[in-house]
Amino acid sequence: MKHLSKAAVLALGVLLATAPVAAASGTDRQAAAPAAVSQAANDPSDLNPEVTDGSNYTGDPTNEAALVASEDQRLIQVRTQASIARWTGSSLNVPYRVASGTGYTLVLTARTKDYTMDDLLSLAPKTFVRQPDGSYLLSENIVIESGATLTLGSSMLLTVKMFSSAQKFVSIVNYGGRLNVAGSATAPVKITSWDVDHSTPRQITDNGRAYIRSIGGTVSIEHASFESLGFWSGRTGGLSMTGSDRPITGAISAAGAALAKHHSKNSKFPEVEKDAAGEPVPGAVLPSDIIPALEGEATNSDFSYVTASVVNTEITDNVYGVFLANAVGVSIHNVTADRSRMDGFVLHRNVSNATIVDSTARHSAVDGFRLSRSIRSVRLDTDKAENNGRDGIYIDGRALATGPSATGTSISSHGNDVVVINSTMTGNAHYGLEIRGGRSTTVRSNTISDSLMGIVVQDAASGVTVDDNHLSNLATQAIALRDGVTGGKITNNTVSNSIVGVYLRDAAADVESNRFTNITNHGISALGAAEISVRSNIISGSGPSAVDLKRAPNATTSHNTTSEWTVTKPFWQMVVSFFQPLTILWTVLGLILVFTALRGRRLKRTIRHPYADQAPMSTFTDLDPLQVRPDSLGPAGPEASSDVSERPRGRRSADEDRGQPGTFRPAEGGHVEAAFS
């Protein structure tokens, strides 16, 4: 190390320090606008226009996104200092301070003893100050390094106010260490942003706002409250436990020690095979034992996945109530997230073995509970999602990619083995519970009411079980499976006061032993060619039909009870059902026949011979030119002309013509002769 140039040391430090932060930003793609995040989760055409998608976020998108990037750079700078010190052999066994951005960052280095409130007062007498009301104002950033523990707690009520103004804000970042917020039932801990200009929690996020984040390491929070924290992104959203998909810098120290020890035992490096001229043989490599195998290093606690426990805690007016990514073994119990400016509880990426129990999300601008892609083995038990701007609970188990991608992400479903049980979803503007993709999701013994729709499963989700739920007062459909769902089980549910009880569209499912009451259109309706079984359901209400399977050719039905169903068709539905193509055609033909018959009766007053108008031409002339002799026509000249002109015009009867000069009558034998007087 002594022979390394300063430039090389700096380059190594930057490289090592950059890895975890860059990875964190890669897994948490929240630097994009919240509206874009929401749009990826939900097709806008599927949203009620009155339902928010996060685009009504009240901050300054341009400035806040820049501040997120600035925070990433600040953390890189802090880690770079630690890396340089480590590589140059300098000792950083005591806390130190780094100038960065608009202020300073106090770095708590590794030690066996916890850092406490007293330590902060001693280390930062000018930036961690006790206020007249007994609270403490923190006006510089804190970073907890790997191997260090910060415990915030007291024997009495403890309030920590984190500086937030139009000029700057502060944060507490646990970088692979341990953060304890240790309150009790009688002495809780309260942490809030603090607008020093107005002496209130900071409401405006345009210029950023104080936040708490853990990158790897461990977080333990009990009997605490957090208010008005965070801005713009998930990792700066208030109370964030993100982890990273790469090891924290300090995690490689053990490996370095192992390498150094191995090298001391083997001071002479082996050489590669050479040819007769002393040149290395092409393809020759060093022996495999030059570097020791480092099995088990990935389990080092300094690695990126965060572990967290949050118990008996209230969170109010954060951008994100609780934000998790790259987390394992997370336990959230009796936590309330109220008035979050985006989502209440977010499990964003690579979260597994997590439980959220007895917790409540209410009045969130978007979703109450949001489980994004790439999660598995998550359980929501006895939770409440009330009056949220979009879905009560949203679960996205779709694949992260549909084909080859720059990151080589798997195309398999990621939202697997999620259980939602004994929970309540009420008053949410969009759906009570929405599931998109994923496998083996179980929804059991929940109560869902007063939403646009109750439970919606779509986007080729497989193996979804919807069992023993109570759904009521849904504006359209209580349970809907659609768009490629397979292996669905809808059993033992109770549905009341909905237009449609169960709706299936291109979804394969068994609908069995459900009870439907006060349904106003169809108890069960299906369309598409998927295999559907409908049996042993009890359906009551009124509408066109209790079970509508006319558009589902592969559906089977048996043992359904519909005796209390009243078949009714509203006027407009009758009109629509009447005006079918064939109905219109036959109606037009019938009208034509009726019109023709009536017109014929009006014109046909007397009985006439059918050929009355087809008389021979001879009946219309006085002379037959074929039978008249020239000498029988009488004298020619003016007299004859005058005689002819003076004759009365028109046809005369045969009796009048008989015996008149110049007239003819038929002779016997059919010949015509001239008759003269």
Language-model-detected regions and their locations in the chain:
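Extended, compositionally simple hydrophobic/Ser/Thr-rich segments
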Residues: 321-323, 330-335, 343-346, 354-359, ...
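Cytoplasmic C-terminal tails of single-pass
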Residues: 603-677
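Acidic, aromatic-lined catalytic clefts of primarily extracellular/periplasmic carbohydrate-active enzymes
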Residues: 437
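Secretory targeting and sorting signals
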Residues: 1-26, 589
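Beta-strand/loop edge motif enriched in small/polar residues
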Residues: 24-357, 361-429, 476, 574-587, ...
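Short, glycine-/Ser/Thr-/acidic-enriched flexible segments
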Residues: 22-23, 400, 440, 509
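C-terminal capping region of solenoid repeat domains
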Residues: 555-556, 562-571, 580-601, 608-611, ...
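Membrane-proximal extracellular "stem/stalk" segments
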Residues: 445-451, 457-463, 467-576
